């Protein structure tokens, strides 16, 4: 099995220390994956769920600290093929539900707060 850590460990100053402690104290060998790998893992896990008749597919993986977006060719489909070969383009935004909540006031989301969140994410696209 592959055990991965994503944006929280990528962006934390002590991410590598955390990974070391998990290994020492729990015995799990976590790998901090880069943004590309995270996007490709999202595609690997979700591509089979897409409508088989779709011309194109967009997969959003909204996490706690980042959001991955992948655009797939819907026509280049083979049941046994690696779905990551269908990726036309991908991006990773350094914002997720936890980071947005932390920056914009937690669970108390007003219309103005929501509009600020939308603007922040839109500026990253």
Would you name each region that the model predicts?
Residues 60-66:
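A short acidic Gly-Thr/Ser loop motif
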